[in-house]
């Protein structure tokens, strides 16, 4: 089974966005819009539970009580020199799974993101409201 720190480091190095930890399948990641397997080994129910325990430990020793009682939990955690992550953990059919969203420490500048000057000029407006909308993962 691939180690959690390797999973998290790999996703940040490859500019991935999401990590999927599900029993019965290898750990998967979304990288540049494409799903990739991280290793060949399928996660057993116990592997998923073990990875979740590690994730909760990284979240400052957060208790798994809510997950066990309610069946889901959402929280964030950081791994020094790697990045921040949001975690949606859940219980389904008696086993645990999780989806992690990578949140890089640094924010790229507008030029690197190819944001037009007209959009950047909106930041200087003194009145009104600017809505930025779009689907999850679209770069809002």
Predicted regions and their residues:
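N-terminal "pre-motor" subdomain/linker immediately upstream of P-loop NTPase catalytic cores
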Residues: 1-135
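Conserved glycine(s) of the Walker
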Residues: 139
């Amino acid at each position: 089974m691939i180690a959690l720190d390797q999973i998290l480091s790999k996703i940040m190095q490859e500019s991935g966005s999401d990590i999927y930890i599900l029993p019965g399948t290898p750990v998967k990641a979304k990288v540049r819009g494409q799903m990739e397997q991280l290793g060949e080994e399928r996660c057993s129910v116990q592997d998923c539970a073990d990875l979740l325990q590690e994730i909760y430990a990284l979240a400052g020793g957060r208790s798994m009580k809510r997950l066990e009682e309610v069946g889901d939990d959402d929280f964030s955690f950081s791994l020094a020199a790697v990045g921040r992550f949001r975690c949606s953990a859940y219980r389904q059919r008696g086993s645990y799974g999780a989806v992690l969203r990578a949140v890089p420490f640094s924010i790229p500048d507008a030029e690197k993101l190819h944001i037009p000057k007209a959009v950047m000029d909106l930041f200087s407006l003194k009145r009104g409201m600017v809505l930025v909308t779009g689907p999850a993962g679209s770069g809002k």
